[in-house]
Every structure is written in structure tokens, then in C-alpha cells.
């Protein structure tokens, strides 16, 4: 039997877990202010007069204000010079103030009024009026819904609307030490949950049961539960993001579990693949090829190297092991990795079309999955962050198919 897989009851596995949140340090108000200052520097270098930061991750990142987007327009203006200005429905203004970390004026609109007109009026009031001859450039955060962009566009003949991604992505891709510490804690928590989940596997258990256990295990280590969870058995493991129907575990099935949690808004996302029982020669070959490809991608991830080269290194490794080429199956049907932070998938991406040079503070998943349709799939997903000395793993990669969690002594 694979080491660490099976042998415990759900109750025993949960009781062995404990809260891991001691000493967590949230992002400070000073750091939010620093982020705003950095964004303003980037705006000035790009000739952008102001950016609209829509409710959601970007608003939280720059202001600390947690507000989920809806059909009602909520967000903040950040001018290239000066203080931020919020926009919100009149009836939400006090709630918004309660959630503020960076406090500022709130411009309000009643339900029968146009928030898009308020958008234009607020810009004019803070010294950015529309000009037809030389329209100021106004960036809209890339997560702003189209219906809001369209509503604004109908009223902004004297403004040039542009994508604010050069500002938002530039600031968010390179994490601070405090961000990396929060991500490290989230990943440490999820690794312990992975070990616990592996220990409860038994013939006849369903993917639904394991999913429920993982949610409770994440709570036990101090998270609010799983941020997401994919549990797959047998042939279903060849589907990167799963199948519709639950599966029941059988002896010698491949198991794939991909899950994560949030700590102060920062996300973990870790996948483990192993066999419930004794690996056969085919399973062992694919698993070893996956581990080799993951290691090749990590080795290629050096400062200044374009993201695409990391993806290419994984694909070259897989071809050498008899898989692919490119996106062909059996092989790797998707990119090698993605950036991660407050969003589970964010820039930059380890994919053939991304020329972004790797830089200190960037954080990535490394998951060059091998899919063998009709048989099984293997995905080993760990994350790394770039330092002045090169890449550093957040979590130790799986040791072997026989001892995926490195438990043997």
C-alpha cells in the first residue's frame, strides 16, 4: 500500500489536525498606502490620469476594502495624483465605510440615478474633466463588467477609456514579503489537509465524502473551509478539472486531489496524485515522468527568463519521456502554470504565449499534468516564488509514487 494512504478513520484524522493560524500578520494599512503610491507612479509613467478600481480583488488589493461585485456599481477612483474617491449606492455608503481600510470620500447615487453619470461628474470634480481635443486617459480595471464599461462609454466622449491592467498587473505580480508569508501559511495548511485526506481513503469511499472531509479539515487547521476542491478517482483523473458524477474508490485506482484555502485573502492551490493500493508499471512510468517534468520547469525558472521558457522546459521533458508533443495526448493539454496571489489564477502565466520575464516576488503554480485518456491522469502541483537567488518552493514536491508525502523514515 502507498505510504500515508488509508488506515485512519475520518474522526481520527480530523482530531490529529490543529489550528495553524497563530502569528498570522494581515496586510497593514501602511502597505495598502504603499501599493497606492506605486500604482500612481505606474499611472504617471503610462500617461493615465486615473484608474477605476472595480469591486472585487483589485479593490481589496489597493484599498483593503472587501466588497464583492454585483449589478450595482461600487469601486474607487485612483487619480495619478491625489486621494482616492469611492463610488457606491447611497444606501450602501455606511456599510462601505465600515469595511474601509483606506478611508476616503464616498460619492453616492440613488437607485433611480445613473452611476455612470456620477463617474463622469466625480472625475470632473477631482480635476479630470472630459476634453474632446485632448481626452485624458482613464483606466478601467480589467475585472470591470462589460455592462458597466458600456454604460460609462455612452457618457464619456471627452475621455479615453483604456485597460488598467498595465497598472494593476504591474503592482500585483510581484509580491511583498508579507504577501509571501500569508501564501506560505495557506499552503502549509493545505499540505496538512492533503495528508489527512490521503489517510482516510478506503475502498468504497466516494469523492463526495472526501470532498466534505477536506472542507472540514481546512476548517480544523484554521481556514473558513476549502476555497475549492477537486477529488477524482480512476479514469476520471484524466480530466484536469473533473467530471460531473462522483466516483467510488477501488483498489489500485489513481487518486487526484486538488484543493486550497484562503488566509487573509491569499490562496493555496496544491494537487497530489497517488495510487490507492500498489502502483502498476504504467502508473509508475507516468507518475515519474510528471515529477521529472515538474522538476524541469522549476530548473528553467530563473530571473529574467521569459515565462514561456518554463512551459517549454516541461514540454521538452515530457516529449523525452514519450508524451506529447505540445498539447497532444497522452501528454500535457494545458499550460504548465499560473500566477497566484489573491486570485487563484492571475498574471503572469507559464504558457508559450507569455513573454513576461521572471522577476523577484512573482509566484507561480508548477503543474505540467499528464493526461492519459481512458486510463488516468497525474498532476503534481506545487508553487514557487522567485527570489534574488532564483526559484524557491513554497511546498516540498511529492517524493515518489510509493511515498508521496515523504513519510518514510
Listing of model-derived features with the role each one plays in the protein:
Residues 1-409:
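Active-site neighborhoods and metal-handling regions in enzymes and metal-associated proteins
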Amino acid at each position: 500500500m502507498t505510504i500515508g494512504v488509508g488506515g485512519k478513520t475520518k474522526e481520527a484524522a480530523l482530531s490529529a489536525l490543529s489550528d495553524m493560524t497563530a502569528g498570522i500578520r494581515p496586510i497593514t494599512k501602511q502597505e495598502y498606502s504603499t501599493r497606492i503610491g506605486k500604482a500612481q507612479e505606474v499611472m504617471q509613467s503610462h500617461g493615465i490620469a486615473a484608474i477605476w478600481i472595480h469591486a472585487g480583488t483589485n479593490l481589496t488589493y489597493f484599498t483593503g476594502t472587501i466588497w464583492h461585485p454585483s449589478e450595482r456599481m461600487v469601486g474607487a477612483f485612483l487619480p495619478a495624483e491625489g486621494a482616492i474617491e469611492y463610488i457606491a449606492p447611497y444606501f450602501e455608503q455606511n456599510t462601505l465605510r465600515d469595511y474601509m481600510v483606506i478611508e476616503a470620500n464616498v460619492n453616492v447615487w440613488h437607485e433611480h440615478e445613473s452611476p455612470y453619470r456620477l463617474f463622469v461628474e466625480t472625475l470632473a470634480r477631482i480635476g479630470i474633466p472630459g476634453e474632446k481635443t485632448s481626452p485624458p486617459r482613464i483606466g478601467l480595471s480589467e475585472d470591470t463588467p462589460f455592462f458597466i464599461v458600456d454604460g460609462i462609454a455612452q457618457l464619456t466622449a471627452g475621455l479615453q477609456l483604456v485597460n488598467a491592467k498595465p497598472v494593476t498587473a504591474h503592482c500585483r505580480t510581484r509580491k511583498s514579503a508579507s504577501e509571501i508569508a500569508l501564501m506560505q501559511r495557506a499552503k502549509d495548511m493545505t499540505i496538512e489537509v492533503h495528508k489527512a485526506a490521503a489517510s482516510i481513503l478506503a475502498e468504497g469511499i466516494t469523492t463526495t465524502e472526501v470532498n466534505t472531509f477536506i472542507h472540514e479539515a481546512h476548517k480544523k487547521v484554521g481556514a473558513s473551509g476549502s476555497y475549492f476542491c477537486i477529488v477524482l478517482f480512476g479514469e476520471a483523473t484524466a480530466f484536469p478539472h473533473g467530471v460531473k458524477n462522483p466516483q467510488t474508490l477501488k483498489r489500485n485506482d489513481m487518486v487526484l486531489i486538488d484543493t486550497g484555502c484562503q488566509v487573509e485573502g491569499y490562496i493555496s492551490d496544491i494537487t497530489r496524485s497517488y495510487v490507492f493500493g500498489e502502483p502498476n508499471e504504467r502508473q509508475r512510468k507516468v507518475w515519474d515522468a510528471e515529477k521529472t517534468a515538474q522538476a524541469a520547469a522549476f530548473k528553467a525558472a530563473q530571473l529574467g527568463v521569459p515565462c514561456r521558457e518554463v512551459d517549454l522546459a516541461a514540454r521538452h521533458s515530457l516529449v523525452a519521456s514519450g508524451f506529447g508533443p505540445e498539447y497532444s495526448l497522452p501528454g500535457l493539454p494545458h499550460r504548465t502554470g499560473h500566477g497566484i496571489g489573491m486570485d487563484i489564477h492571475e498574471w503572469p502565466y507559464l504558457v508559450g504565449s507569455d513573454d513576461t520575464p521572471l522577476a523577484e516576488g512573482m509566484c507561480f503554480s508548477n503543474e505540467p499534468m499528464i493526461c492519459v485518456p481512458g486510463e488516468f491522469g497525474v498532476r503534481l502541483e506545487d508553487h514557487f516564488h522567485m527570489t534574488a537567488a532564483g526559484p524557491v518552493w513554497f511546498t516540498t514536491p511529492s517524493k515518489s509514487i510509493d511515498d508521496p508525502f515523504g513519510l518514510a523514515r
